[in-house]
Amino acid sequence: MAKTPVRARKRVKKQVVDGVAHIHASFNNTIVTITDRQGNALAWATAGGSGFRGSRKSTPFAAQVAAERCAEVVKEFGLKNLEVMVKGPGPGRESTIRALNAAGFRITNITDVTPIPHNGCRPPKKRRV
């Protein structure tokens, strides 16, 4: 008995006007994730995934390229306003925000959500070069 062909349904792109850009800027890499207000990820990009390897991953330019790649994908959702949450001490903090602003998003507010311990775990020992 022949099976009837299964037709793939067209995926409906959801329209999102407001979003949140989560920027994780570590010393070695920068991760940009853009979500909707509920926290569902719409797109993400990293400096390493954008073609930068080794010490070039940890540059502000690599973070800027990652933000631009993420912004391209999210434009299809109709995103207009962004709230930015920055975490970490890395070199890509400021350049990522500038790139998102230059991509045409209206940045409503910028929040620093870097976790600061109230004397929690012992930090790693200092480097001796």
UniProtKB/Swiss-Prot annotation:
Signal peptide region: none
Gene Ontology CC terms, in alphabetical order: ribonucleoprotein complex; ribosome
UniProt keyword annotation of RNA-binding present: yes
Claim: tRNA processing is one of the keywords in the record: no
One Pfam family named in its UniProt record: Ribosomal_S11
InterPro entries (alphabetical): Ribosomal_uS11, Ribosomal_uS11_bac-type, Ribosomal_uS11_CS, Ribosomal_uS11_sf
UniProtKB keywords: Ribonucleoprotein, Ribosomal protein, RNA-binding, rRNA-binding
GO molecular function: rRNA binding; structural constituent of ribosome
A single BP term in Gene Ontology: translation
Assembly, per entry: Part of the 30S ribosomal subunit. Interacts with proteins S7 and S18. Binds to IF-3.
PANTHER family assigned: 40S RIBOSOMAL PROTEIN S14/30S RIBOSOMAL PROTEIN S11 (PTHR11759)
Record-stated family: Belongs to the universal ribosomal protein uS11 family.
Job description of the protein: Located on the platform of the 30S subunit, it bridges several disparate RNA helices of the 16S rRNA. Forms part of the Shine-Dalgarno cleft in the 70S ribosome.
Name of this chain's protein: Small ribosomal subunit protein uS11
Organism for this UniProt entry: Pasteurella multocida (strain Pm70)
Name of the coding gene: rpsK
